[in-house]
Amino acid sequence: LDLEDSVTPADKAAARTYLKDFLSKVESKKRISLRVNELSSAFAKADIDLICGFNPQPLSSVILPKIHNLDDVKSWAAKLPAGMELEVQIESAMGLIQAPHIASHPQVISLAFGPADFMASAGMPSSNPGTPWPEVANALQWPLMQVVIAAHAHGKTAYDGPYFQISDDLGLS
């Protein structure tokens, strides 16, 4: 489930209301993860209040976007229910450099590479429309492998981000 990029700012409150209703009816045996808004955003407190308002807790994990360092993870962990599993998105140059430290947190169960925000953060050429996809994909291999290595060094799962060339059936497969 997502409260971040897939929900416009104007629709955040309505999305939370819908999720509160939906999650209150969900069977506890289901594995459910929720991506929240960045901690520094105006929307994070309401996301935290939503999550902390459940008893029993229907969420298995919380997906944390735009994590830049271990302190970001610690801040989230302190605000969420005790022991909540955290899935961290590495979406910035600083997050990439700090990925091994981020992965060391005991509540972190996975690292995911977020290529779009990462490219913007790193000033990569793919943030310019028209950059050929093979050039972009090649440029993303090194940071992606750093996320994979950081995750696996700490016994965590690593995920790649979305594949943007959805009309490329061969590449998408």
Regions from the PLM with identified roles:
Residues 1-173:
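Expand to "…catalyze enediolate/carbanion chemistry for C-C bond making/breaking, isomerization
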